[in-house]
Amino acid sequence: MINKMYAWRGYAGTHRLEEDNPNRISLSASDRGEVVGTVTLGIDSPVGLLADEIFKDQLDHFRDMGGKLCEITKLAFDPRVRSKEALAALFHILFIYGRRIHHCTDVFIEVNPRHRRFYETMLGFSCLGEMRTNPRVNAPAWLLWNNLDKVQEQIERFGGTSSHPGNERSLFPFFFSQKEEEGIARRLMSIG
């Protein structure tokens, strides 16, 4: 699915999930048994993050301040599926893994300029530095950042309110409620 979606967007390279990498967690969303979306969370380690290839200077700033970093990579979602709930569920579970299970403080994502506004508006990311070329996909990329405590505040405030989101235009109302998050986090921690 990743190669199909990336090729459709004109990105170069072969993209595969790294099942044998203990610092990467890949999730998928299914609809009636068919995978409709996938995303990977990379946890910082001595080998670093994929974003270090072009944004190491910016990531090192957060490391130097004592941050524990993670990154979102390999997001692919079937464009025929218009489900904010499915997309929000994938992101919420990623944030649970990052913050609650791996105790990360900061999350990063490299995005094509055409997707930057989505992440800023829908998930509260902020742009860092200047645009650079990502050699893994041979395309321009921005490095976006979000503080996971800030993400958690938004989840606590808006999660589970999609039936009455008010003026909130982000994905956070489609995230799980706090009670649902607690149950999911307990189950994820119990399986290791």
Tell where the protein language model's regions lie, with residue ranges.
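Short amphipathic alpha-helix that is part of the acyltransferase structural core
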Residues: 1-36
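Short, His- and charge-rich active-site/binding loops that engage polyanionic ligands
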Residues: 32-62
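Intrinsically disordered, low-complexity acidic/polar segments
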Residues: 36, 48-50, 81, 118, ...
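Acyl-donor binding region in acyl/amide transferases
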Residues: 54-150
